Amino acid sequence: MSPDCTFNEKDIVFYVYSRDKRDGIILKKETLTNYDLFTKSTISKQVVFLIHGFLSTGNNENFVAMSKALIEKDDFLVISVDWKKGACNAFASTKDALGYSKAVGNTRHVGKFVADFTKLLVEKYKVLISNIRLIGHSLGAHTSGFAGKEVQKLKLGKYKEIIGLDPAGPYFHRSDCPDRLCVTDAEYVQVIHTSIILGVYYNVGSVDFYVNYGKNQPGCNEPSCSHTKAVKYLTECIKHECCLIGTPWKKYFSTPKPISQCRGDTCVCVGLNAKSYPARGAFYAPVEANAPYCHNEGIKL
């Protein structure tokens, strides 16, 4: 039977976390305008949207862990977007091409919905769009890109940052900017590549980190494991001071320099402060098999 992955705004749920709502609360579309979470105190907060990918949910364990890491790090307002029906969570399997194609088609709808939510935050609750960051995994990375395009169409400006966690590869390998996550979708676009099979293997951001050359990740035997590691790497970079260092790399043409030769103007730390480093382009990031994963030989950038 064909999977029913029909997108409907009414099916979207938001899991919202903050320092005074650490266990999270659940919002739906009809409650967005009257919930007391969005008050005058929201204006000054840094807001982070988390957007999951194919077959996943907004309260998957990796996103819950990242949400907790974010609110421990700073007074973030974290909004995890659950579009699980549109992502075929209940109906498809990883081998279901029809279900996946439907989920791909739904990413634009979800992106527009996130952009409309952003408009509400900006216009009604006076949140600065320069304080809003999107973090998307797999299809969620491209969804974040579509949201970034939509907020620009709405003349709201650009998001502060989009972090694409191993943006989905299938159906996107030959896509141009209008049809995928792109460097122009936010003021700064950071991309973490961890699977050459399930993720895109070309530069799409201001900085593109190829962790372990963007191929199989340490400790992983399946592509799905490597694909998910991007989420875990970022979470650990948020939780710990340990810097996962990226050193400049021209794919296919050169061997990256050892991180022992890194300087603050040539290399970049993966994570929320990546934009503070001047270097742009593609970077190779060596990684350890176990958390906190960083392989930096004690180097301080």
From Swiss-Prot:
Keyword field contains Hydrolase: yes
Record's catalysed reaction(s): a 1,2-diacyl-sn-glycero-3-phosphocholine + H2O = a 2-acyl-sn-glycero-3-phosphocholine + a fatty acid + H(+)
Chief location bin: secreted
Phylogenetic classification of the source organism: Eukaryota, Metazoa, Ecdysozoa, Arthropoda, Hexapoda
GO CC aspect terms: extracellular space
Gene3D superfamilies: alpha/beta hydrolase (3.40.50.1820)
GO terms, biological process: killing of cells of another organism; lipid catabolic process
Top-level enzyme category: hydrolase
Active-site residue list: S138 (nucleophile), D166 (charge relay system), H227 (charge relay system)
InterPro entries per the UniProt record, alphabetical: AB_hydrolase_fold, Allerg_PlipaseA1, Lipase, Lipase_N, TAG_lipase
Keywords: Allergen, Cytolysis, Disulfide bond, Hemolysis, Hydrolase, Lipid degradation, Lipid metabolism, Secreted
Paired cysteines (S-S): C5-C88, C177-C182, C220-C225, C242-C269, C243-C294, C262-C267
The protein's name in its UniProt record: Phospholipase A1
EC number: 3.1.1.32
